[in-house]
């Protein structure tokens, strides 16, 4: 079912798709604009989040994002949604953007990723049950023309799909999970997508 073309939409499935699209866009909007109480309403009570700098519950994710206190807006492109009764998977293509000072030079980090949302319908309302990223590529460049040079050796220990993101998070004092999903590990990624499909089609209840 996952990655297959959706059947023609009925009125009910079209409304469900609109609700899910609104939910995932609003979750990122809330995160980008520090609307923590609003962000909290997007997650199911048993939600689990697994991204570069955080792994834990939805509630903990909101509190950790608040404590991080860093502006990192998301440029959202397109999203694809698959719905199966009370479960759904949405894949959002986005670029995570942030600026930070490295060696007194203002730098721009852009990280391209697919944000994977697994959603459940609870009492006629959709909630995020699980959120994870598939990392693709990133870049780190000076904001203004500069002779700033970072040694390639500094990036060799990082995964190519999120090397610059990992470098910046480490620079800011955050630990990074180096075993996340990324296009540089296609076999593991295919297994991950199969696992998602099993969950979506009710062949499995686990997403961890």
For the regions a protein language model found, what residue spans apply to each?
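A hydrophobic membrane-anchoring alpha-helix module
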Residues: 150-208
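Short, surface-exposed coil-to-beta transition loops
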Residues: 74-76, 109-115
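A solvent-exposed, acidic/Ser-Thr-rich amphipathic alpha-helical stretch
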Residues: 36-98
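Short, cysteine-centered beta-strand-loop-beta hairpins and adjacent loop/turn segments enriched
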Residues: 97-109, 137-141
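Short, low-complexity N-terminal intrinsically disordered segments enriched in polar/charged residues
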Residues: 1-29, 33, 41
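Short beta-strand edge/turn micro-motifs at domain boundaries
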Residues: 89, 114-163, 173
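Outer-membrane beta-barrel proteins
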Residues: 15, 69, 105-107
């Amino acid at each position: 079912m996952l990655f297959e073309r959706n059947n023609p939409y009925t009125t009910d499935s079209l409304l469900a798709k609109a609700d899910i699209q609104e939910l995932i866009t609003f979750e990122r909007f809330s995160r980008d604009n520090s609307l923590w109480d609003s962000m909290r309403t997007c997650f199911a009570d048993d939600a689990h989040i697994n991204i570069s700098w955080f792994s834990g519950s939805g509630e903990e994710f909101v509190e950790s994002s608040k404590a991080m206190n860093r502006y990192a807006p998301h440029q959202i492109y397109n999203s694809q949604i698959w719905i199966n009764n009370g479960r759904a998977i949405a894949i959002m293509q986005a670029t995570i953007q942030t600026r930070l000072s490295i060696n007194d030079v203002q730098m721009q980090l852009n990280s391209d990723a697919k944000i994977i949302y697994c959603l459940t319908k609870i009492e006629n309302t959709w909630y995020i049950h699980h959120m994870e990223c598939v990392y693709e590529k990133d870049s780190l460049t000076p904001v203004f023309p500069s002779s700033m040079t970072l040694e390639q050796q500094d990036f060799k220990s990082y995964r190519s799909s999120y090397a610059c993101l990992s470098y910046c998070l480490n620079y800011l004092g955050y630990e990074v999970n180096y075993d996340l999903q990324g296009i540089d590990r296609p076999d593991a990624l295919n297994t991950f997508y199969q696992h998602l499909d099993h969950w979506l089609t009710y062949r499995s209840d686990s997403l961890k």
